[in-house]
C-alpha cells in the first residue's frame, strides 16, 4: 500500500507537465479558427445571454449543419464561477475565452490522466511515465486539447470510455460510447465499435449484456440531445444525425477538399505522433498492445474511405497509439544487451525531436490568427468612448474573431455578409481581407488604422538558429472612416 502511495506521489509532476504544456499552447495561441466557432460562440452565449436565446449567435449564423449544445452547456457550467468573478471585477471578456478553453483542456487532460493510471496498472510505471512525456511533447494533441472543436469535445469523453474498456467496466464503456457517438461524433461508432466487437470475439462480454445497456443508453442519449438541441435550435433536430447524413450519406464534406486514400497513414499520423511513431512497432513486442492497435488502426483505415480528411478527425487514436510507443520506449530501456547510454539517448533524443517540432509548429501557429490580433489592436488603438460601428468580413471572422473579443458593450460589431458599397460607408471601422484592390475602394473615405500580418508558410534558412524563416504577409487591414456619409 505504501509503495502505491509513493508511486502516486511521484506521478503528480507528470500531471503538472501536461497542464503546463497545454497552458503554454493556450497562451501563445489564444485565438480560434472558424472550425471552433460554433462551440465557442455557444458557450459565450450561454454564459452571457443565458435564457435570452434570441441573442444567440447561431440564429444569425447557423452554419452548414446544426451542432449540439451538449458540449457548450458542460463547458459553460464549469466555466461560469470563474467567468462570474471576472465580470464582477470588470475584467475583459477575452480572459473568459481563455477560461473556457482552459476548462476544455482540463477535461481532456483529466481523460489522459485517467488513462495513464490504467496504463500504470497494466503496463507498469515506466510505460506510464513515457506515455505522459510522449503526449506532452506532441504538438497536435496539446495544441488541440484546448480548442472548442467537436472532435476535441468528443475526445474528452472518448478517453474515459477507452479507460473503462481497458478496465473491463463494460457498462460504463457502453454508456459513454452511446453518449459520445449519438451526441457528438457518429463516426466514433467505428473506433468504439471495433473495440466492442473485439471484446465480444474474446468472449469477455455477451451480446445480451451489451444490449441490456446499449438499448437504454442509446434511447436516453438520443432523447437528451434531441430535447436539448431542439430547444436551442427551435425546431425538432438531432444534430449529429444531420451531420452524419450530410457528411457520410450525401458526402457533402468533400466540398471542403479531398485527400488521397492513404493520407492519414503517410501524412496525418506522422505529423500527429511525431518521432514517437517509430517506437510503435517496438511496442508490438508486447502482445497486450494488439488490442490497442486493432481499434485505432481499423478506425483510421475505415475513415480513410471518406474523401475529405483532416488530422483532427483521427485525434482520438493518438493517445492509444502513444501507449504502444511508450511500451516501445520501455522495451529499448530494458534491452540489457545495449549500452545504457545508447538506450537512454535513443529515448531521450526522440522526445527532444518532438519538443523541437512542437516548438517550431507552435511558433508558426502563433501567426495564424490575424482576425484575433486585429480585434485586439482595434481596442488598443481606438479610445473606448468612441462611437464605433465595426464591420467584420468573412476572412477576419474565420481567423480569430469571436464574441469574447467584443469587449466594449457600447460598440456595435457586425458580421453581415454581402453588404453593398453604399452601406459600407455607414461603418466607422472596417476589418477586411487585404485583397489587392479592396482597400483602395475606400481610399477617399477611410484611412488604414492597422495592417495585420499572417503566415504563408516557412522557408529553410541554414544561416540562423532556428534554421527557418516564417514567411509573413499582410492578411487583414483595419480601416477607420474619415468623414461621415452625407
From Swiss-Prot:
The chain crosses the membrane at residues 12-32, 69-89, 94-114, 123-143, 146-166, 178-198, 213-233, 265-285, 291-311, 313-333, 344-364. Keywords: Endoplasmic reticulum, Glycosyltransferase, Membrane, Transferase, Transmembrane, Transmembrane helix. GO terms for cellular component: endoplasmic reticulum membrane. GO terms for biological process: dolichol-linked oligosaccharide biosynthetic process. It comes from the Eukaryota. InterPro entries: GPI_mannosylTrfase. It is found in: Endoplasmic reticulum membrane. It is an enzyme of class 2 (transferase). Pathway: Protein modification; protein glycosylation. Its main location: endoplasmic reticulum. Its EC number is 2.4.1.260. It catalyses: an alpha-D-Man-(1->2)-alpha-D-Man-(1->2)-alpha-D-Man-(1->3)-[alpha-D-Man-(1->2)-alpha-D-Man-(1->3)-alpha-D-Man-(1->6)]-beta-D-Man-(1->4)-beta-D-GlcNAc-(1->4)-alpha-D-GlcNAc-diphospho-di-trans,poly-cis-dolichol + a di-trans,poly-cis-dolichyl beta-D-mannosyl phosphate = an alpha-D-Man-(1->2)-alpha-D-Man-(1->2)-alpha-D-Man-(1->3)-[alpha-D-Man-(1->2)-alpha-D-Man-(1->3)-[alpha-D-Man-(1->6)]-alpha-D-Man-(1->6)]-beta-D-Man-(1->4)-beta-D-GlcNAc-(1->4)-alpha-D-GlcNAc-diphospho-di-trans,poly-cis-dolichol + a di-trans,poly-cis-dolichyl phosphate + H(+). One of its GO terms (molecular function) is dolichyl-P-Man:Man(7)GlcNAc(2)-PP-dolichol alpha-1,6-mannosyltransferase. It holds the Pfam family Glyco_transf_22. It is a multi-pass membrane protein. PANTHER family: DOL-P-MAN:MAN(7)GLCNAC(2)-PP-DOL ALPHA-1,6-MANNOSYLTRANSFERASE, GLYCOSYLTRANSFERASE. Belongs to the glycosyltransferase 22 family. Mannosyltransferase that operates in the biosynthetic pathway of dolichol-linked oligosaccharides, the glycan precursors employed in protein asparagine (N)-glycosylation. The assembly of dolichol-linked oligosaccharides begins on the cytosolic side of the endoplasmic reticulum membrane and finishes in its lumen. The sequential addition of sugars to dolichol pyrophosphate produces dolichol-linked oligosaccharides containing fourteen sugars, including two GlcNAcs, nine mannoses and three glucoses. This is Dol-P-Man:Man(7)GlcNAc(2)-PP-Dol alpha-1,6-mannosyltransferase. It comes from Mus musculus.
